């Protein structure tokens, strides 16, 4: 009967924390199943971190379409269908859900430390823009908390470059951080972290949870949820701010989000925005309800307001914030905070190569070249240090918080394939998440940026034609692995031979001489047999054949003479050349389609014959030969062109005369006439 038993609800989850460590939750160790409530998972994480002020934090995940969600403590894991569809294993991201309006008033050091890690991550990834002077001050506090007091023997030149604080970190900023760090003697890590938060909370974008939306004419806006209210950004500028006490309704329907605000004249105004998708709109609505409840209402009104706000959504969409509000947390006297004898364990931050003088050979690709210039005849030089490529920390085994877009470390799925929009980031950085950029992907390697850059250079060095060959080699490799023993070895050997042969065939060669030889042979062949040419495509040109044109122009002299001074008798005695053309009979096929008829005629005759046959009647079947001969000069009796046609006969005669010039032996110019006769014997239809 065991086969009829229910399948055990196995659950395997990885939680990525703010200090870049990982917590694994499984059914065997913690007893977590798919029927477990989200609050149980949160409790395991809070106990691991030793947090008591837990209402500021949450767990986030994303679905297959890279839409982010917060784990609902009141629902079971199985009810989070978007999460279940992504695994197993499942990945959750720990972070701040509600930013404290004044993080310096947090009661415990461990809570402030988690806020410090989150805000430092926000500044590093561009979600918290900082002026240069503020960034230098915050970086100095972070270095003081990380390394302690400045020691000239331990902290040599360029030691600040081992850490990253802002995107596109410059050398000038690192020098300013080093100068300020020397003035922070005696500050403990907890004090330095407190000063860091005190500086960060004054920034405009502190604690802003951004959501991309669209306004009128599909113009891009950002709605930011803050402790004080909702701010609206357009083109990196704040265009509106609505405080929570003034917001009377939040509503969504499909992809439309409504924000109703009470004005100073006690009139309500509704603002409508369009979200990217229905799930994104619902997520924005949920976050708005939770922020409004957490920061706005006192403890006596929080439940009633939550029920009221839950009715603002569409039918069957109700959401209630189940946690405590900020006011409830401040008035909670059940736990005496801070707890005595609390020891906060801090982790080292991710490190990068130090900016040092160049000691590597010329061909090194890992460290950029630096130059040393001697000034005023001194022996010591001024060294210009350029930031090297970042590498993975020797201690951390996870992939997070990269300021460089081409690092080989893995990122959160909503960072890599998120919406192409952002507030303070460029178009290349707009795939970053509005929150929680740390991530893990199971099948990605964790190499350094140097390895990835070298790999990209190697890939670019190959010919573009190797793409199809690479796919073919992969298919061959997969087929080879299905066998075993000597057959597999032989197939692998053949595969290597084929790969080497393919690489040799793909080498670039100079094809200029070969191409010239082909053109030369083709030209000789065409000169030997003009009728051997076959066109493989439609030719839109109807010009005569070049060879026929050259043959015709041999009998024509192009020096024109003005006949105004010649007498009437001299004009009558103008000599001319009689030229006749001939060719092989050509079979003409009648067709209903003019295009196919023209194509058939062009494929059956040369270009020279096409010009001669342009006057042939389409109703005939055969065209007799049109020979090309040179006749002796003949005398004409007129200076004008004469056309003789015999209607109803089989032959037609066309005579044309033109005045050309010749030079007699005495050196006097005389006028000549070239008489061109086109004779065509037509076979009548029987």
From Swiss-Prot:
Its main location: cytoplasm. The modification Phosphoserine is found at residues 304, 389, 393, 402. It holds the Pfam family FERM_M. GO terms for cellular component: cytoplasm; cytoskeleton. Residues 11-299 form the FERM domain. Disulfide bonds: none annotated. It comes from the Eukaryota. GO terms for molecular function: cytoskeletal protein binding. Residues 518-527, 547-561, 648-658 have a biased composition (Basic and acidic residues). Gene3D superfamilies: 1.20.80.10, Phosphatidylinositol 3-kinase Catalytic Subunit, Chain A, domain 1, Pleckstrin-homology domain (PH domain)/Phosphotyrosine-binding domain (PTB). Residues 332-669 are annotated as: Disordered. InterPro entries: Band4.1-like4A_FERM_F1, Band_41_domain, Ez/rad/moesin-like, FA, FERM/acyl-CoA-bd_prot_sf, FERM_2, FERM_central, FERM_CS. Transmembrane segments: none annotated. Keywords: Cytoplasm, Cytoskeleton, Phosphoprotein. It is found in: Cytoplasm, Cytoskeleton. This is Band 4.1-like protein 4A. It comes from Mus musculus.
């Amino acid at each position: 009967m065991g086969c009829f038993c229910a399948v055990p609800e196995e659950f395997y989850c990885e939680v990525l924390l703010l200090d870049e460590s990982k917590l694994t939750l499984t059914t065997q160790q913690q007893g977590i199943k798919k029927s477990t409530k989200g609050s149980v998972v949160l409790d395991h994480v809070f106990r691991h971190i030793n947090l008591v002020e837990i209402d500021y934090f949450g767990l986030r995940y994303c679905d297959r379409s890279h839409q982010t969600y917060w784990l609902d403590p009141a629902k079971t894991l199985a009810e989070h269908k978007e999460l279940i569809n992504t695994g197993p294993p499942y990945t959750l991201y720990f972070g701040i859900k509600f930013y404290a309006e004044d993080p310096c008033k947090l009661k415990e050091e461990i809570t402030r430390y988690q806020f410090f890690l989150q805000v430092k991550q926000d500044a590093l990834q561009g979600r918290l823009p900082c002026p240069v002077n503020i960034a230098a001050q915050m970086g100095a506090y972070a270095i003081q908390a990380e390394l302690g007091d400045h020691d000239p023997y331990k902290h040599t030149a360029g030691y600040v470059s081992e850490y990253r604080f802002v995107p596109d970190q410059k050398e000038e900023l690192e020098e300013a951080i080093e100068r300020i760090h020397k003035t922070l003697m005696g500050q403990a890590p907890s004090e330095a972290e407190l000063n860091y938060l005190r500086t960060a909370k004054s920034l405009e974008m502190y604690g802003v949870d951004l959501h991309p939306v669209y306004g009128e004419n599909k113009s891009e806006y950002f709605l930011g949820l803050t402790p004080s209210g909702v701010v609206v950004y357009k083109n990196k500028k704040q265009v509106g701010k609505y405080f929570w006490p003034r917001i009377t309704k939040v509503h969504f329907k499909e992809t439309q989000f409504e924000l109703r605000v009470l004005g100073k004249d006690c009139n309500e105004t509704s603002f409508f925005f369009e979200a990217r998708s229905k799930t994104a709109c619902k997520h924005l609505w949920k976050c708005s309800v939770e922020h409004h409840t957490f920061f706005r209402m006192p403890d006596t009104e929080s439940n009633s307001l939550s029920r009221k706000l839950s009715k603002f959504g569409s039918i069957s969409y109700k959401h209630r914030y189940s946690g405590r509000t900020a006011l409830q947390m401040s008035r909670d006297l059940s736990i005496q905070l801070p707890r005595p004898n609390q020891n906060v364990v801090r982790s080292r931050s991710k490190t990068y190569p130090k900016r040092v003088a160049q000691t590597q050979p010329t061909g090194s690709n890992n460290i950029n070249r630096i130059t040393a210039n001697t000034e005023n005849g001194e022996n010591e030089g001024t060294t210009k240090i350029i930031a090297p490529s970042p590498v993975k920390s020797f201690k951390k085994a996870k992939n997070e918080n990269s300021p460089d877009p081409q690092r080989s470390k893995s990122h959160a799925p909503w960072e890599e394939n998120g919406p192409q929009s952002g507030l303070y980031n460029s178009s290349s950085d707009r795939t970053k998440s509005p929150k929680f950029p740390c991530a893990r992907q199971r099948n990605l390697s964790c190499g350094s940026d140097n390895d990835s850059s070298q790999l990209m250079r190697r890939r670019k060095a190959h010919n573009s034609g190797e793409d199809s060959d690479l796919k073919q080699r992969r298919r061959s490799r997969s087929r080879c692995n299905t066998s075993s023993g000597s057959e597999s070895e032989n197939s692998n050997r053949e595969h290597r031979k084929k790969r080497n042969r393919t690489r040799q065939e793909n080498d670039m060669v100079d094809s200029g001489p070969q191409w010239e030889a082909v053109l030369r042979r083709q030209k000789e062949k065409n000169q030997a047999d003009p009728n051997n040419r076959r066109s493989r495509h439609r030719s839109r040109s109807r010009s005569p054949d070049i060879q026929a044109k050259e043959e015709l122009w041999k009998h024509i002299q192009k020096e024109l003479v003005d006949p105004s001074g010649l007498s009437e008798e001299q004009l009558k005695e103008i000599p001319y050349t009689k030229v006749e053309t001939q060719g092989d009979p050509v079979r003409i096929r009648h067709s209903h389609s003019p295009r196919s008829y023209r194509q058939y005629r062009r494929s059956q005759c040369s270009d020279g014959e096409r010009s001669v046959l342009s006057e042939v009647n389409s109703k005939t079947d055969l065209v007799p030969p049109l020979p090309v001969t040179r006749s002796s000069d003949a005398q004409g009796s007129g200076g004008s062109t004469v056309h003789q046609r015999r209607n109803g006969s089989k032959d037609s005669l066309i005579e044309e005369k033109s005045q050309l010039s010749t030079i007699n032996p005495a050196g006097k110019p005389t006028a000549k006439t070239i008489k061109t006769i086109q004779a065509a014997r037509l076979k009548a239809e029987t």
